[in-house]
Every structure is written in structure tokens, then in C-alpha cells.
Amino acid sequence: SLSGEIPTDKMTYRTNPSTGDKVSILGYGCMRLPTIEKEGEEGGDEIDQEMVNRQVDYALAHGLNYFDTSPAYCKGRSERAMGIALSRHPRKSYFIATKLSNFAPATWSREASLAMYRNSMKELQVDYIDYMLLHGVGMGDGMKEFNARYMDNGLLDFLLEERKAGRIRNLGFSYHGDIKVFDYLLSRHDEYQWDFVQIQLNYLDWRHAKEINERNTNAEYLYDELAKRKIPAVIMEPLLGGRLSKVHDHVVARLKQREPERSVASWAFRFAGTFPDVLTVLSGMTYMEHLEDNLHTYCPLQPLTDEEMTFLFDTADLMMQYPTVPCNDCKLSLIHI
């Protein structure tokens, strides 16, 4: 990655049109926080709170202000760890995003889902949530599961009321899977007024998502549907589960020839950040070096030129000719992101 100090005052920000929030283009994904092994316990690792605190402090000091967690992350321990780290800072200095991650049928009842929502506030040590998401709509069996999780139990109505009361400042959803659910929720935008939507977007998924996994939808369609309605997009999987930082040698050579000083990953982060209706790009930064490299990329962001965009789309086409791309065994599919 680029050598030299990372400036603390050069972060690129995007403005959320519904609240005026100035959100850093780099968002901190809290799904894989650093851990330490606990001695003598089977599979017993615990979150390295000291390291989480250090990385959060470093991120905030360099202008990053958006943190994305969920009750489902880190075996259910991510929210607590983020609450501990962030509550050491003024509440107005960060935006916290969490989700109603009621995937298990046991959590579909109104009581269980409300308990999950209230527990998030408690773990995060906050009395309002900046960005609240319906988590992974389109997963499982599509509309049927969506209705069971959010409609039949009155949960969506409840969350809309919470937004009115100010306990939720922005309400949105993250989408994976059945496109019917995505299209349905956007068709109700006049009624629900989504403040943001979280989608998987990267230069491979832009036009090849369906080829990689037929359950997915090309990012070009998802982004365009949001941009048409001026709904800010939050980006997940900018590296496609790490695959865009671990590419074939010939792709590495191709990227390095263009930008010898920049990391392979930085191309993917610049790609995601170049789109004007993107509010923030989430990166799961387990290690300080991930954080530093991404801060280099986004302090400030140098958007891709049209010519560089074409170069990346050609790179994606090239990558699709190599059938070894598909799975990096990141286990994401097993934990309902």
C-alpha cells in the first residue's frame, strides 16, 4: 500500500439527503472483530476488546464515523464490543448501524423481535439508532419469509413508528437473494420512505453476480433502481468476501502495472466509492493494516475515471474466464449476513 502518514482531515464524506448526516465514505463492518484465544476452552476465542477500542479510536481520529453491526455478528458479541468501544466517545461523533436479525423462526414472534431490538440498544449503550436495517431481506424463501419476519408480526409498522419517535433516525434494509422482495420494497417506497438500502456491489458483481451465484442479482440493476429513486446505497461486499484482494497473479500484474503503489484491494474500494449515490462502503476490518490501507484509499477518495472503469469491467470479464473464482470459503453464507 502507499507509504507515508495517513492524513486525519482528508476523509471523503457523502451527505445523507434525508438527515443531512455527513457520512464517511468508508464504513466499519463489525462482523469479524479481532479475537484472542482463551486458554483451555474448546473453540473458546473472545473478542479482543483492547484491539477493538484501539481500531475504533484510530478510525474516528481519521474521520471514519459509520459503524455497521448486528445481533448476529461475532457469535452475538459484536454489538456489546462496539458499545464498549464507541461509548467512550461523544454520541454525536459516530453513526451506528444495526439490524433486526430475526433469521431463526423462534425469533419471528413480535415479542422475540422486539426483545432483539431493545437488546441492541442496551448492548450498544444508546437511546437511538442512527441506521436500522431489516436484515437480509430476500433470504430463505423470499416473500414468504419476509412476511413472517416483518409484516405478519407488525414489526415493520413498529419500526416506522420508532422512526417517527426519533429512536430510529434512518430506516432501511439489506438485500440478499430473491429479487422479488427487493422490487416489492422499492415499489412501496412512497409509503415507507426508505432512508437507505444496503446492497452487495463490486466490479465483479456489477454484471456477473448471477453467473457467480444464481440467487444473486447484478449490482448494476440494484444500484440503478436505488439511484432512480434517490435512495442512498450502503455497500457491502466491496471485495466480494475478500476475493477481490486475492486475485490470480495475472490480474495482480494487470492492476499493478497501472498503479504500482496501490494495493489490489484499493481498486475495488475506489470502484464502490465512485458512484455518487453511495453513502458509505463497508469493509470488515479485522486487522489494523486493513484499516490503514482503506484509509489511504478514502482520505481522500480519487474516483475512477471512465477509462479506469472500463479497465475494471474488462478485468472482471477476464476473471470470469477463470472458473476458480467462485468461493473463497469465507463462511459468510453460513451465518446470514
Region locations from a protein language model:
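N-terminal binding-site loop/beta-alpha segment at the start of enzyme catalytic domains
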Residues: 1-94, 127, 158, 164
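Conserved, mostly hydrophobic/aromatic
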Residues: 16, 28, 67, 82, ...
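A short, structured active-site edge motif that brings together acidic residues
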Residues: 92-105, 134, 199-201
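CE4/NodB-like, metal-dependent polysaccharide N-deacetylase domain
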Residues: 112-133, 161-165
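Conserved small/polar residues in nucleotide/adenosyl-binding loops
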Residues: 335-337
